[in-house]
Swiss-Prot record:
Domain of life: Eukaryota
PROSITE patterns in the cross-refs: CHALCONE_SYNTH
GO biological process: flavonoid biosynthetic process; polyketide biosynthetic process
Species of provenance: Hordeum vulgare (Barley)
Lineage: Eukaryota, Viridiplantae, Streptophyta, Embryophyta, Tracheophyta
Root EC class: transferase
UniProt protein name: Chalcone synthase 1
GO MF entry, a single one: naringenin-chalcone synthase activity
Active-site annotation: 167
EC number, as in UniProt: 2.3.1.74
Length: 398
């Protein structure tokens, strides 16, 4: 019997009509809150490093300049006292770290996912795809499998597990979810980024100041979004449309940010020129993303930028002459949570849509229609996502 449909007809039936859309956002942190003003004393005490007075003063200056007010960490004083090797600089401790993150990464991801699913308001059986991202540990079956079981998702949900990507990956997961949603009619993609610093926490050492930068910046957090095309406006509330997404490796940036999984945990290596490398290339990324739209004024778009640290934000602002309010949501999340790696940009997206409603703006993007989301991380890799906001009057806020 001859086929009644062509391949082209099958493909057209499989594709969505409209762009991928963020339909819900949820975030979660551990209960343990650490205030930055107190952290240097705590960190040098718990790592038994108070004798390193000069290094402690350097660390205090790092924390003072970080623009971070507080962070959340699963690692408590009690956990660290039970695992002294995690407090050393070079002691073998990977097994202890793995035992923690294998359990806690999916658990924190579940808390964020439950909030997103509640806001979405649809049955979990409608989730067709799961994208899970973490830089915290590796395991088989992965955190995607664990979360599928925890949430009671269908066993046939199509899963993608992303381990060890780093800070740019909040953009990566949106790019992947966009492709999944737009190429699978009716797809609803649950995206989860969950990060626990138990894999990177370690004691100080005079020869490794870039490791101290990480100790001053990193915090724990998980964020989840639900993404789908062609939303059913009778039951779903769009928040942002994902218009385009791209990834690039910056020229002459090899070795600028590295992470290596070793017996001592995930070690962090950073070159001083990271803010310069990013700011030098930011305008090109913006031009390539917005030229098709005829946009070349960077204060006319809303900004969601991975808050790798204040120096990166300062130099990007200076390079493209940004008004201070453009980075308000980004700097707020930096202040209140620190650097949560892949989860950061989703926290910022959540902050932006909530504050836009509170401040009486017309759209979820601080009153503007178009926006940009940047992920920066190892490579140096940059993810660029062009967003379109939706009118708040359409019920687009949580």
């Amino acid at each position: 019997m001859a086929a009644t449909m062509t391949v082209e007809e099958v493909r057209n039936a499989q594709r969505a009509e409209g762009p991928a859309t963020v339909l819900a956002i949820g975030t979660a942190t551990p209960a343990n809150c650490v205030y930055q003003a107190d952290y240097p004393d705590y960190y040098f005490k718990i790592t038994k490093s108070d004798h390193m007075a000069d290094l402690k003063e350097k660390f205090k200056r790092m924390c003072d300049k970080s623009q971070i007010r507080k962070r959340y960490m699963h690692l408590t004083e009690e956990i660290l006292e039970e695992n002294p090797n995690m407090c050393a600089y070079m002691a073998p401790s990977l097994d202890a770290r793995q035992d923690i993150v294998v359990v806690e990464v999916p658990k924190l991801g579940k808390a964020a996912a439950q909030k997103a699913i509640k806001e979405w308001g649809q049955p979990r059986s409608k989730i067709t795809h799961l994208v899970f991202c973490t830089t915290s540990g590796v395991d088989m079956p992965g955190a995607d499998y664990q979360l599928t079981k925890m949430l009671g998702l269908r066993p046939s949900v199509k899963r993608l597990m992303m381990y060890q990507q780093g800070c740019f990956a909040g953009g990566t997961v949106l790019r992947l979810a966009k492709d999944l949603a737009e190429n699978n009619r009716g797809a609803r993609v649950l995206v989860v980024c969950s990060e626990i610093t138990a894999v990177t926490f370690r004691g100080p050492h005079e020869s490794h100041l870039d490791s101290l930068v990480g100790q001053a910046l990193f915090g724990d957090g998980a964020a989840a979004v639900i993404i789908g095309a062609d939303p059913d406006l009778s039951v779903e509330r769009p928040l942002f449309q994902l218009v385009s997404a791209s990834q690039t490796i910056l020229p002459d940036s090899e070795g600028a940010i590295d992470g290596h999984l070793r017996e001592v945990g995930l070690t962090f290596h950073l070159l001083k020129d990271v803010p310069g490398l990013i700011s030098k290339n930011i305008e090109r990324a913006l031009e390539e993303a917005f030229k098709p739209l005829g946009i070349d004024h960077w204060n006319s778009v809303f900004w969601i930028a991975h808050q790798g640290g204040p120096a990166i934000l300062d130099m990007v602002e200076a390079k493209v002459n940004l008004n201070k309010e453009r980075m308000r949501a980004t700097r707020h999340v930096l202040s209140e949570y620190g650097n949560m790696s892949s989860a950061c940009v989703l926290f910022i997206m959540d902050e932006m849509r909530k504050r836009s409603a509170e401040d009486g703006h017309a759209t979820t993007g601080e009153g503007m229609d178009w926006g940009v989301l940047f992920g920066f991380g190892p490579g140096l890799t940059v993810e660029t996502v062009v967003l379109h906001s939706v009118p708040i009057s359409a019920g687009a806020t949580a």
